[in-house]
Amino acid sequence: MDKEKLEKEVIKLLSKKKKPLHFLQIAKALGLGKKERKTLKKVMRKLKKEGKVKVVKGKYEYTGEEVVTGTVIAYPGGFGFLEVEGGKDIYIPPFEMVKVFHGDVVKAKVTEFKGKKEVRIIKVLKRAKKDIVAKVVFEDEQCYVVPLDENAHHRILLSKKDCQKLKEGEVVVLKITQFPTKKSPARGKVIEVLGNPKEKFIAIDVIIRKYNLPTSYPEKVIKEVEAIPEEIPEEEIKRRRDLREQLCFTIDPEKAGDFDDAVAIELTPEGYYKLYVHIADVSYYVREGTETDKEAYKRGFTYYFPDRALHMLPEKLSAKLCSLRPNEDKLAFTVEMVFDESGNLKAYDIYESVIRSKARLTYNEALALIVGDPALEKKFPNLVEPLRMMETLYRILSRKRWEMGSIDFDLPEAEVIVDEYGEPTAIYPYERHVAHRIIEHFMISANETVALHLEHAGYPCLYRVHEPPDEEKVENLLEILEGLGYKVKRPHEYTPKFFQKIIEDFEGRPEENLVRFLTLRAMARAKYSPHNVGHFGLALEHYAHFTSPIRRYPDIIVHRLLKKALRGEEIDYEKTLAYLEEAGNHLSKQERIADEAEMEAIDYLKARYMKGRIGEEFIGIITGVVAFGFFVELEENLVEGLVKINTLTDDEYVFDEPAHRLVGVRTGKVFRLGDHVKVRCIAVDEERARVEFELIEKLEKHETL
């Protein structure tokens, strides 16, 4: 009898019996032999854990309840869902949500109401956080705060002492002193006043506190880093490959303060391309188990905002010791790769090195040298030839990856320019060109080679994995594309090539970026894992993150594993695998937090910026259609806003959900995904980072202002 069937039989037996039964009584009643009793033990443990049975004086009794453990996910309407690992999310009604906060881990009883499952919370096992960012409200001589996150369904009471110091509308950070129950609301103590959003721009500070991002380093870390010598020991240089005479250089954004990677190139006697990718050897300075290492692991990543960066590593490491600054001796980890004229990897070598970068180029300077800018050629005469050789190799590698099916999403991103006070002064699409692509492709090659080497060496690795997309999401994508008039021939299996072709078919069309975005949205999220399932988007069997150890902790882990593999060190494979499993989960979670915080910051800055442009006209593309209107993304600055359906006064419009469009009842006029429209900005809700437009006209052809 299999486990599932046995579980049902046990529940059936215990629910019929009025008295509790011993284990042997259950086994005998079900006619189980000695071998099957082992399975029964596992089943009873499972049922006990789930709360379906309880043990009373050594006997099992059916409780008639299903008890689950999960994480609370709050929604704006005051309701929530319990996220149960390995199971479906279960609805939490508003009267239960008053007891919990978003992210709390709870034990709950599953019940049914009107034929649908919902939960009743038994106990909070772990609180998500104790510090909350909230807005002050005065009402009926009472003072309370409303959280500015998923916990907005709570009203948190403050002491009279706190209330006397505060003003209506101020944003504060508070510590929860008394958690809510069904009968009494939460209480809190103000620990920081961020200010009034009407008087100064505090959105980034709010986001940093909301996500509990670190703004300073523990004293132990500061002291530890201060003690690191700035000079590289001579014995360390001697044991490494000395490449200080090599012509290598860095290419980075204009505002970059830390340089993870440097590149060099030469031709072999056979006419092949020998590419050197030098990566900052952060793991030399950040030793495993140190206070600095623990703090870097906890953070996981550097958090980037338009007006600041919260670095994973202290400045002495990130911007000085580790950074591959020009004309300074630096410790590096080098991946040396030889490619033929078709982009095939013919040979590679990986080793610890000492290098000396000869120049610090920006992406725009690199591009200017490639296309032949006389002034820059005069400034960097020795970089022209290697850069043009790099461009040739990039095009070879790009062609090779295209043949393999690599998907190039290449979505435009908004660059927000802020002044000294953090106020947005300009927003425009960030331009990516051939210099960006050169570095991108070289880094992909190094990352792939490192992952391949670790697997061949028999060592575990923290892979960067990207699973194939969920079929339901793909089907939704294809339905939308069909609404755009694209004829889809569904294959037996969805491969990277299939999605690559979709994007290629829309190249040069007005809907190109929209289709790239919709295709990306259908993809699974990439994550970190010791279990190699390949990288679907890049169409690679082996991939890891190795090239950005100053700003990503996963890369430091890979560096350490690689060093052990190169030295032939013995490792406890199972113990290492367990660590990588835990680290992969933690770092994937931290990456999501970084992405969400950074995107939210951009949204707030966009809203702040558009407040100064109310009344102006723009051209945009419809990126989403819903029952209450449609969303428009502006071409000029990638700001997205809503055109409400009740502002479309020329007709009565109905939502055609399958076709993702609004249709006029009398005129038959249609607004669908991909349509270009002229709109006017009419309102901005800064607090919720929302922009509202009104339609001026639908553009039949792609026009410009």
From Swiss-Prot:
InterPro entries named among the record's database cross-references: CSD, CSD2, NA-bd_OB-fold, RNase_B_OB_dom, RNase_II/R, RNase_II/R_CS, RNase_II/RNase_R, RNase_R
Catalytic activity: Exonucleolytic cleavage in the 3'- to 5'-direction to yield nucleoside 5'-phosphates
Disulphide bridges, residue numbers: none
Subcellular location: Cytoplasm
Residue ranges of every copy of the S1 motif domain listed in the record: 615-696
Catalytic activity, EC: 3.1.13.1
Alphabetized Pfam families for the sequence: CSD2, OB_RNB, RNB, S1
Annotated keywords: Cytoplasm, Exonuclease, Hydrolase, Nuclease, RNA-binding
SUPFAM superfamilies in the cross-refs: Nucleic acid-binding proteins, Winged helix' DNA-binding domain
Domain RNB: 240-567
Gene Ontology process terms (BP): mRNA catabolic process
Keyword Coiled coil: no
Main subcellular location of this protein, as a coarse class: cytoplasm
Family: Belongs to the RNR ribonuclease family. RNase R subfamily.
Protein name from the UniProt record: Ribonuclease R
Upper lineage: Bacteria, Pseudomonadati, Aquificota, Aquificia, Aquificales
Gene: rnr
